[in-house]
């Protein structure tokens, strides 16, 4: 227990030391060119408005969710035979979510 506490304290001290060294050695030039947006080498004129497509955000979110569910499937499939019930329940849940996304029209690739 003492060794674990020593490792924890050493890790926290090392983490704080690296953070402090990084803070002290970093360049703190907050000029206009440093904090402004880069537009092909020209100085930006006016307010820059970032357009963000919610459609692609939803597609990315669905990809991440289904990707994580596939990883969970792999964990279930390598275990014993009694876990197939939970596998089927999770699979039905995923198919239900996929059907709901299809029903609401969120799987359309054309904007």
UniProtKB/Swiss-Prot annotation:
One of its GO terms (cellular component) is mitochondrial membrane. The chain crosses the membrane at residues 1-21, 56-76, 85-105. Keywords: Electron transport, Membrane, Mitochondrion, NAD, Respiratory chain, Translocase, Transmembrane, Transmembrane helix, Transport, Ubiquinone. The keyword Electron transport applies. One of its GO terms (molecular function) is NADH dehydrogenase (ubiquinone) activity. It is an enzyme of class 7 (translocase). It is found in: Mitochondrion membrane. It is a multi-pass membrane protein. Its main location: mitochondrion. Disulfide bonds: none annotated. GO terms for biological process: mitochondrial electron transport, NADH to ubiquinone. Gene3D superfamilies: NADH:ubiquinone/plastoquinone oxidoreductase, chain 3 (1.20.58.1610). It catalyses: a ubiquinone + NADH + 5 H(+)(in) = a ubiquinol + NAD(+) + 4 H(+)(out). Its EC number is 7.1.1.2. Core subunit of the mitochondrial membrane respiratory chain NADH dehydrogenase (Complex I) that is believed to belong to the minimal assembly required for catalysis. Complex I functions in the transfer of electrons from NADH to the respiratory chain. The immediate electron acceptor for the enzyme is believed to be ubiquinone. Belongs to the complex I subunit 3 family. This is NADH-ubiquinone oxidoreductase chain 3.
